[in-house]
Swiss-Prot record:
EC number: 2.6.1.42
Top-rank taxon, per record: Bacteria
Biological process annotations from GO: isoleucine biosynthetic process; L-leucine biosynthetic process; L-valine biosynthetic process
Cofactor(s) named in the record: pyridoxal 5'-phosphate
PANTHER family: BRANCHED-CHAIN-AMINO-ACID AMINOTRANSFERASE (PTHR11825:SF44), SUBGROUP IIII AMINOTRANSFERASE (PTHR11825)
The protein's name: Probable branched-chain-amino-acid aminotransferase
UniProt xrefs under NCBIfam families: ilvE_II, PRK13357.1
Gene expressing this chain: ilvE
Amino acid sequence: MTTPTIELKPSAHPLSDSERAAILANPGFGRHFTDHMVTIKWTEGRGWHDGQLVPYAPLSLDPATMVLHYAQEIFEGLKAYRRPDGSVATFRPEKNGARFQASSRRLGMPELPVDTFIEACDALVAQDEKWVPAHGGEESLYLRPFMIATEVGLGVRPANEYLFIVIASPAGAYFPGGVKPVSIWVSEDRVRAVPGGMGDAKTGGNYAASLLAQAEAAAKGCDQVCYLDAIERKWVEELGGMNLYFVYGNKIVTPSLTGSILEGVTRDSLLTVARDLGYEAEEGRVSVDQWQRDSENGTLTEVFACGTAAVITPVGTVKRAGAQWQQSGGETGEVTQRLRDALLDIQRGTVADPHGWMHTLA
């Protein structure tokens, strides 16, 4: 199968150096976007074609475009980092590309070759390289590849036309004032996904389904919501957009992939990093009752969440119906901080990359 080369059609009017510098001084997250985007089309019978890097601009969609009605949409999230020598590298883009393919299969969409996924990301980062923040802090350039069904029509079936796009947004430090534990509401009424559903696909529908539960968590005074399994309503699965880890002294456990949990790239990486640091890291099942009991008796020493945006987020206060408890006295635990520092050091290029995770742009 042939894949398109990315044709470069750069903007004649990119943002000025001073305008870009003002944004990079306080980028936030997802509020500003670089000068360009990459687009690739897919048409039934023709496959992937017309790969282009073009100026960032709005999309024009017919009101009957199928994605607007039947939600054939998937996305990814990864970061580009400035290295100490001034070069730029992305973190494990092949893992994101493979997960993008898995999401495509689940939603009946065409699979973009992983090499093309990486080529598209590389092309955008290379063109907008000045948008990658300076080395030294936790700032990065966040990449958002996504794909939508663009065929026009109201028939309920897989579309025969799609558009793949990559956009980029400078991202500030997730914890600009230092790492702070988050509070969690354990929802025993709402579920994120069911066996045989789309829980292991990165698709917008899963996030839309989480918004009500997130609002309920906020009403309980919590930052995040934790979901349990859909069958027994007892096994811990994940947060709305992050995986969870439980620390039992030298043993670290993350919920096993069940088909209803998203296979996070950070989650996978931390299993390896933890073992490199001498911890016993494994996948297993943790019930919410066990979580509460082991926290209260002191055997569960720390809990943290992980994902691309924040890397690692310590868990402080946990609430469920009729109960409340704290992890690590509401502070960031020693193991949590050690793992966070170790992974960030690899991503920022301040230590060796023993597993070849960083993809440096030529």
